[in-house]
């Protein structure tokens, strides 16, 4: 059912947006990794999921699971609910388990959507997850206004190891890794 729903969503999206994807060859065929993208619209996870060959287990704010149809889709794609007040240990544990099971975790380093042109604040959670799993990160940049019939450009960078695995990581390491990942995401957007 998952594949059928993704195909239907892709057809729907192709009717309202002109999606152009660069770097699909950079998406690993197997193994756990963290797909990290900028977050400008509620369309972002759908644009990424319908154009990437791997199933992505996105982290999504818990409030979305209270909206009937949205909740149904999120449960179908096995999104991980995240409580936004403070740190959500259950969500972090689920994210780590997802990656260690060989799956792709989708995460937006700034958390909630950033307004157009605003970068938002990079959260350290992605650095924490990268250190705990020793998983590579796959930077993705979306450039779009998401107006009807507009062009949506998705640039996928190369997978990179952001944690060297040496020593015990600190809170500063988590912040540094998160910022490096976000810098790579922004760099992908400079060509648009």
What does each model-found stretch correspond to?
Residues 25-28, 96-97:
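Short amphipathic alpha-helix with an adjacent loop that forms part of the alpha/beta core around
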Residues 14, 27-86:
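Catalytic core of membrane glycerolipid acyltransferases/transacylases, capturing the structured
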Residues 14-22:
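Short gly/ser/thr-rich secondary-structure transition/capping motifs
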Residues 3-12:
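N-terminal nucleotide/polyanion-binding subdomain common to many enzyme families
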Residues 90-192:
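Non-catalytic C-terminal accessory region of glycerolipid acyltransferases
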Residues 9, 76-81, 109-112:
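Short, basic, glycine/proline-bearing loop/turn elements
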Residues 21-24, 67, 89-92:
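Structural motif corresponding to alpha-helix initiation and N-cap regions
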Residues 5, 65-70, 147-149:
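Short, glycine/polar-rich helix-capping loops at beta-to-alpha or helix-loop-helix junctions
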